[in-house]
């Protein structure tokens, strides 16, 4: 449970350090007006809205951990693109990539449901949400500090590289410390049992066709 809480804390710091503190100014710096700025800020949520049901199904099929890792890789790619983005199209691409695979809330909550009892579930979801909220407090402050105080020459590269480095740390945490949830293990056992039963039926000489 602790690796998951640390993961979401770091993930939200990375996300909010860019989306809140840096993205609006980055887009304006590239020539966008107020309307375009708001559209770019909402792109992530818009894409996530349509992608979330599919991500949920994939997490049911392949497990929570693989989907969290995939989401983390997508965030790493997204922030790396934003770090070097010199056009609005590249910024848009980065937000679409992040939105397509974002699942820290839905899959993270499902993971908690898989590994906790009904009695303790609300407590651990509370810890998870607290880490999420704390990340949103710290992230924008860090992003603003890294971007600098000069409005004519903000350091977008430094802020986005920080976010990408946070994603890299999260990859390490997910790979080596987060255990697979019991839903995938249960699913694998059911699949093996089903296949063994089919095999026994086929090889059973007493079964008539």
Model-derived features: positions:
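Helix-loop-helix hairpin linking two adjacent transmembrane segments in secondary transporters
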Residues: 128-175
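Helix-loop boundary and gating motifs at the non-cytosolic
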Residues: 1-45, 209
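Helix-breaking motifs and short loop linkers at transmembrane-helix boundaries and internal kinks
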Residues: 31, 63, 84-89, 101
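Residue-level signature of mid-helix packing/kink "hotspots" within the transmembrane helices
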Residues: 45-53, 103, 136-137
